[in-house]
């Protein structure tokens, strides 16, 4: 079974700013997420601390020796929603900056699918 993967506009903006090589590295990990879904664990996926959402995870990508992260959640329909990404090299505050950002994006996403009647 393949798991559904969706992405937000914010993720897409980040993705479009990546080089082709960076996109390839991230795409490999997204492919693993598509294949294994919520069963994918460390070292590829880890739980994010400090999120308002207990199901907030990070996709852990290494590219050219640098750590990239994609924050995502499985929504109530069990689709993986890619929220935001970034290269955390040299940024000790990456999680402090990106987790609240991803929380806001996911809140807005949930409201949108609720309004469309896709979830109760």
Model segments located where?
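Basic, Lys/Arg-enriched alpha-helical interface segments
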Residues: 1-67, 76-80, 87-120
């Amino acid at each position: 079974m393949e798991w559904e993967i969706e992405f937000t506009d914010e993720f897409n903006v980040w993705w479009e700013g990546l080089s082709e090589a960076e996109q390839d590295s991230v795409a490999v990990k997204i492919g693993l997420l598509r294949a294994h879904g919520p069963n994918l664990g460390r070292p590829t996926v880890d739980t994010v601390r400090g999120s308002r959402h207990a199901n907030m995870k990070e996709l852990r990508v290494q590219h050219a020796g640098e750590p990239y992260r994609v924050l995502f959640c499985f929504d109530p329909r069990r689709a993986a929603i890619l929220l935001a990404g970034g290269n955390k090299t040299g940024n000790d505050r990456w999680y402090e900056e990106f987790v609240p950002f991803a929380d806001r994006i996911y809140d807005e996403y949930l409201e949108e699918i609720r309004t469309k009647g896709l979830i109760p």
